[in-house]
UniProtKB/Swiss-Prot annotation:
MF (Gene Ontology): 1,4-alpha-oligoglucan phosphorylase activity; thymidine phosphorylase activity
Keywords (A to Z) from UniProt: Glycosyltransferase, Transferase
PROSITE patterns linked: THYMID_PHOSPHORYLASE
Domain of life: Bacteria
GO cellular component: cytosol
Alphabetical list of SMART domains matching this protein: PYNP_C
Stored NCBIfam families: PRK05820.1, T_phosphoryl, Y_phosphoryl
Entries under PANTHER family matching the protein: THYMIDINE PHOSPHORYLASE (PTHR10515:SF0)
Protein known as: Thymidine phosphorylase
Taxonomic path: Bacteria, Pseudomonadati, Pseudomonadota, Gammaproteobacteria, Enterobacterales
Taxonomic source organism: Yersinia pseudotuberculosis serotype O:1b (strain IP 31758)
Length: 440
C-alpha cells in the first residue's frame, strides 16, 4: 500500500519511482482517489526532475492499462495491426490516405484519432465533414469494420486510457503540458491501447509544429520510439517538415476533398505524397508486409494506381455510415462555403517564410476549428491552392484561395494570410520534407 503524497515526495527529492508506485498513482487518478492537487504536484515534479526510461515505460503502461486494451486475437486477422500518430500540423491530412493505402496492402489499421487542438486540424473534424460519418461506432461495429474493410478511424471512447483524460486536464492548467515524459505517456497510452503490433510516429518540425525547435522535436521522437519499443510495440519515427502547410489545403471539407483526389489520382501534392508514402513505407516494413523500402513503395504505388486504396476508403466511409458512393460523388456531398476567392500579396516577391501556426489559426478564426471545446465547426471553410515556399507571387499568382461564409470573415482571413507569409527577393534555402528517421 502506498500513499500518494509519499510518491510525490520521493519524486520531488529526485528519486526514481518504482513501477508499482507509478501504477498505484495512475490507478488512483482513474478511481478519483488522487486529488487534482496531487496530480498537479506530481506533474510538476516530473517536469523538473524528468523520468528515466524504465519510469517512462511504466507510466505509459499504467496509463494504457487504466482502461480497456483492445484484443484482436478472436478475429484471426491475417495481417499486422499497425497505426500512425502525428504530433499535428496544418494541412496534415495523411491519415485519410495512409489508412486505406496500408489496408489495401494487407495491414489492419484501427486508428483512434482526435479533434483539432489549437492551430492544428483534427482528423475526426475532417471526417465529420462527410454527411452521416459515424466517429463513435460501438465496439462490435468497430471490430467488424477492421475485419471486413481493414481500416476504421474513430474517436477515443471513455474506456480507453481514462487516467490520461484527467491527467491531461490538470497538466493543461498547470503549465506542465510540455514535459516530454508526460507527452510521451499521453500519446502512447491511447495508441498502445489499440493493441498494435507496430506504430509509426510523424513528429513535425518547424513553424507549425507542436514543439518549438528541431532539437525538442527530435527529443520527443526519440522518447516516443524508446518508450513504445520498451512497451513491446515496434515503433519508428519520422521528423517531417511543418514550415509550410503540408497539403494544398487547410480546413475540414477542403482537406477531405484533397484526400479523395489524392487517392483517385486526380491530384497529388508532391510534399503530401512524399510524407504519406514515407509513413506508409514505415508501417509496411514494421508490420512485415514488405521486404525492403523499394518493395514497400512498389506495393503502395500499385494500390494507388489500381484504385484499391480509393476503394478501401470508400468502403470505410460506407461502413461508418457515410454515403456509399462518396468517392464517386464527393463534390455533391461535401459542404461548400458561400464565398471562395483568392487573396493576393500587396507586393510582388518570392515567398521566403510562412508562419504555419498563424495560417492554422486563420482557419480556426473562419470557423474551421474550435477556440473552446463546445464551439461548433464550420466544415465548409478553409484555405485551398496554398502557395509554396519559393513561389513568386504577384497580381496573377495568389497566396491562397479563402473559403468563407461572409465578406467580413474573408477580409479577416485575407489579412491573417498576408501577415503569415513573408516575401523577399531571393528564394529560401530548400528544407527537406523528411529530416530524419529514428528507430531507437
Amino acid at each position: 500500500m502506498f500513499l500518494a503524497q509519499e510518491i510525490i515526495r520521493k519524486k520531488r527529492d529526485g528519486q526514481p519511482l518504482s513501477e508499482e508506485e507509478i501504477r498505484f498513482f495512475i490507478n488512483g487518478i482513474r478511481d478519483n482517489v488522487v486529488s487534482e492537487g496531487q496530480i498537479a504536484a506530481l506533474a510538476m515534479t516530473i517536469y523538473f526532475h524528468d523520468m528515466s526510461m524504465p519510469e517512462r515505460v511504466a507510466l505509459t503502461m499504467a496509463m494504457r492499462d487504466s482502461g480497456t486494451v483492445l484484443n484482436w486475437k478472436s478475429l484471426n486477422l491475417n495481417g499486422p495491426l499497425v497505426d500512425k500518430h502525428s504530433t499535428g500540423g496544418v494541412g496534415d491530412v495523411t491519415s485519410l490516405m495512409l489508412g486505406p493505402m496500408v489496408a489495401a496492402c494487407g495491414g489492419y489499421v484501427p486508428m483512434i484519432s482526435g479533434r483539432g487542438l489549437g492551430h492544428t486540424g483534427g482528423t475526426l473534424d475532417k471526417l465529420e465533414a462527410i454527411p452521416g460519418f459515424d466517429i463513435f461506432p460501438d465496439d462490435n461495429a468497430f471490430r467488424k469494420i477492421i475485419q471486413n474493410v481493414g481500416v476504421a478511424i474513430i474517436g477515443q471512447t471513455s474506456s480507453l486510457a481514462p487516467a490520461d483524460k484527467r491527467f491531461y486536464a490538470t497538466r493543461d492548467i498547470t503549465a506542465t503540458v510540455d514535459s516530454i515524459p508526460l507527452i510521451t505517456a499521453s500519446i502512447l497510452a491511447k495508441k498502445l491501447a489499440e493493441g498494435l503490433d507496430a506504430l509509426v510516429m510523424d513528429v513535425k518540425v518547424g513553424s507549425g509544429a507542436f514543439m518549438p525547435t528541431y532539437s525538442l522535436s527530435a527529443d520527443l521522437a526519440q522518447a516516443i520510439v524508446g518508450v513504445a519499443n520498451g512497451a513491446g510495440c515496434k515503433t519508428t519515427a519520422l521528423l517531417t517538415d511543418m514550415n509550410q502547410v503540408l497539403a494544398s489545403s487547410a480546413g475540414n471539407g477542403v482537406e477531405v476533398r484533397e484526400a479523395v483526389r489524392f487517392l483517385t489520382g486526380e491530384y497529388r501534392n508532391p510534399r503530401l505524397l512524399e510524407v504519406t508514402m514515407a509513413l506508409c513505407v514505415e508501417m509496411l516494413l514494421s508490420g512485415g508486409l514488405a521486404h525492403d523500402e523499394a518493395d514497400a513503395r512498389a506495393k503502395l504505388q500499385a494500390v494507388l494506381d489500381n484504385g484499391k486504396a480509393a476503394e478501401v476508403f470508400g468502403r470505410m466511409v460506407a461502413a461508418q455510415k457515410g454515403p456509399v458512393d462518396f468517392v464517386e460523388r464527393y463534390d455533391s456531398y461535401l459542404p461548400v462555403a458561400t464565398l471562395s476567392k483568392p487573396v493576393f500579396a500587396e507586393q510582388t516577391g518570392i515567398i521566403t517564410a510562412m508562419d504555419t501556426r498563424a495560417l492554422g489559426m486563420a482557419v480556426v478564426a473562419l470557423g474551421g476549428g474550435r477556440r473552446r471545446a463546445t464551439d461548433p465547426i464550420d466544415y465548409s471553410v478553409g484555405l485551398t491552392e496554398m502557395a509554396r515556399l519559393g513561389t513568386r507571387v504577384d497580381g496573377q499568382q495568389p497566396l491562397a484561395v479563402i473559403h468563407a461564409n461572409n465578406e467580413d470573415d474573408w477580409q479577416q482571413a485575407a489579412e491573417a494570410v498576408r501577415a503569415a507569409i513573408t516575401l523577399g527577393n531571393n528564394a529560401p534555402e530548400e528544407t527537406p520534407v523528411i529530416y530524419r528517421r529514428i528507430t531507437e
